[in-house]
Amino acid sequence: MLLAKGGLHDGDYRFKEIIGSSQRAACLASGECDAVPLSQPEDVVFARKGFVKLGDSLEVVPNLQFNVIAARRSWAATHANAMVALARAFGATFRFLRDPAHRNEVVRAIVETTGADATAARAILALYYEPDRGVMPKQGEMNMSGVAAVVALLGTAGRIPPPLPPAERFVDLRYLHEAGLQ
């Protein structure tokens, strides 16, 4: 979709499967790859090195559920208290991340966990929150229209056969409801 938005069509490029943003970054840095999808902080770091950002996935899919925590339904059902506690912890974490009063602490955490510098960490936060692009939950809630967009993308890629199931097939909201987050 992003390639088509840029005017490229099938046959204009070839794909090479490289799993992991840091591995794709290494392919780009070595010159073996001409362009690669990168996540943060690699995209910020490479832009600062002079590489050109060709686009952003949010340009073509602005409403997408990016991250989830998955558990087997059978395990979750027998560990409901842990599921609710985890949901509450995630809610507190996302509220903390969004609060500008904690920005410096969040920047330090990004630096410590990713190895990026503070400038890159601030750029990552700006990407998500300045303005708020709806990428990250406000308090750990599930973006069901974003899940539906993921299902549609998987259908387009042939990973889920038609007819496409509803997003609710893949998500059990009871723990988020019990935690007061959904």
Predicted regions and their residues:
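Bilobed "Venus flytrap"/periplasmic-binding protein-like clamshell domains
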Residues: 1-48, 144-149
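Helix N-cap/coil-helix junction residues
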Residues: 8-10, 116, 159-160, 181
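Secondary-structure end/capping motifs
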Residues: 77-161
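Hydrophobic alpha-helix position signal
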Residues: 3, 46, 110-111, 154-155, ...
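Conserved C-terminal helix/tail region of periplasmic/extracytoplasmic solute-binding proteins
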Residues: 148-182
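Positions that flank functional sites
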Residues: 18, 43, 61, 169-170
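Residues that form or immediately flank small-molecule/cofactor binding pockets and catalytic motifs
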Residues: 20, 58-59, 172-175
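Pocket-lining segment of extracytoplasmic ligand-binding domains
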Residues: 23-114
